Amino acid sequence: MNKQTILRIAKYISICFLTVFIAAIMLGGGLFLYYVSNAPALSESKLVATTSSKIYDNNDELIADLGSERRVNAQANEIPTDLVNAIVSIEDHRFFNHRGIDTIRILGATLRNLRGGGGLQGASTLTQQLIKLTYFSTSTSDQTLSRKAQEAWLAVQLEQKATKQEILTYYINKVYMSNGNYGMQTAAQSYYGKDLKDLSIPQLALLAGMPQAPNQYDPYSHPEAAQERRNLVLSEMKGQGYITAEQYEKAINTPITDGLQSLKSANSYPPYMDNYLKEVIDQVEQETGYNLLTTGMEVYTNVDSKVQQRLWDIYNTDEYVNYPDDELQVASTIVDVTDGKVIAQLGARHQSSNVSFGINQAVETNRDWGSTMKPITDYAPALEYGVYDSTASIVHDSPYNYPGTSTPVYNWDKSYFGNITLQYALQQSRNVPAVETLEKVGLDRAKTFLNGLGIDYPSIHYANAISSNTTESDKKYGASSEKMAAAYAAFANGGIYPKPMYINKIVFSDGSSKEFSDSGTRAMKETTAYMMTDMMKTVLAYGTGRGAYLPWLPQAGKTGTSNYTDDEIENYIKNTGYVAPDEMFVGYTRKYSMAVWTGYSNRLTPIVGDGFYVAAKVYRSMMTYLSEDDHPGDWTM
């Protein structure tokens, strides 16, 4: 092949590449123009304001007006340089050099996402974040090419119309800062009793780091996470040359509580609604991608205000339950068994009215639900998969080791009943038959069955026959009152599992609306659900759940008690009597399912004596209120 031929081939290839390149640019440009043609118009009023969201109960009565609580806007000349440096350090290093979009950041994020297989994440400038907060959903599923194009287009437009100082001011006044505070000046006054200009570098660094996850980095509810985030901001400030090494060392060694004052209540709603509203906020964001704290909307929920108020009264007075002390905690969830509507939920006793959307133990999975796991992990799968054919099947309560080990399984009383019926094993909450049943079912089948009831483990073990303990308890894995109430609802509802639903309708600011409901999915055969209910009726009438029994009300349920390890008892508990870290009761009627957890915030503070009866009594008091004027009747096949 001569030199001229090679040159012709090279020229041909170059022309082809150039043609493809030009075509790609034209196609991309056309697609970009199509996307941005549907972008909303820039509006200073929207950049400045945060419209409040109104929340209604299941009778369409207003229960909260969120977003209207506190707002003190900072003027541009009131914003300290250290705050600006902190914000750009953690959010947008090249903020003062780009014009709305950062091509270097886009290329870096693209390479990271290609390596990690992720979506269009990590490339947003501070200007784009402001646009997103003002106009768009923050849901990961909504980070589409169309949305990204519109976001970039509006960011470039905003940079042409506003100065960098104005954009920063919009952002500083726009962001949600937890506990009902909107804008960093509002947070400064609420948390420190000072204006922004009077705060120290570590205090400003904390505020600068909060907007990405304001409730998670709340220094009152999550001081450790807040300190970690603050220190990351300080590290970035040092790396960018905004503070010296000496200033950095001094700042990171400043306690996160330095200067914090007691919170004053800013809530426009009663304290008994706080936990429920937190879950409403989360579900709205899961379903729509919008944060109702920064996006105006009307949300219609499933909470029954009267039931929620009664649950609060049961927790916080001695009129219904005699508590052993003020420190014993309770967390519970009540769902409608037919559609999963959460009609009431409360995560603690004696909650502070000064904290908004704090930890809600009712949805946390960090405590062990003990023997309440037996119906859903062991016995229901055994009936479903034909391991046992009736409630009268014989099981063995005799010396037995966890499969594949030399570790014995003990019953709570360290004794054995011999051959007993399946019903009696569940009624008396015997551990040995439960673990042996799980072995017969098989771990894989049990895990699949649990998944159908909304419960999962990173990996399931034979110990999970009588425990919900898991290596990861981040609400995804393990059990909570929310998860257990919904799981047991499937027994009450003929085997149909309903997803817990807090919201039923949203009306957006543009007048459009969306309804939310869950028709449920079949988790087990109707016969399985009926046999499980038949067995668990005897738990209340004759077994471990007699404290929840109401002779006039057809209901079923299961008690649960977790255990300390021998090491914990020897080194920490040092109590020779019967003690436990957690006591639970999960029960249901044909209409409602309720799960109750009791225990101390410090797990090493044991439940003793009468404390073991609190969970059943809370359930009994609530079910009496729910059913005495609305008798749900009995189950039939």
Swiss-Prot record:
Q: Name one GO molecular function term.
A: penicillin binding
The protein's matches in SUPFAM superfamilies, at most eight in alphabetical order, are given as: beta-lactamase/transpeptidase-like (SSF56601), Lysozyme-like (SSF53955)
Keywords, A to Z, come to: Antibiotic resistance, Carboxypeptidase, Cell shape, Cell wall biogenesis/degradation, Glycosyltransferase, Hydrolase, Multifunctional enzyme, Peptidoglycan synthesis, Protease, Secreted, Transferase
The pathway noted for it is: Cell wall biogenesis; peptidoglycan biosynthesis
Where does this polypeptide localize?
Secreted
Residue segments, region Transpeptidase = 298-612
Q: Where is this region: Transglycosylase?
A: 62-224
What is the name attached to this protein's record?
Answer: Penicillin-binding protein 1A
Organism of derivation: Streptococcus oralis
Give the gene name: ponA
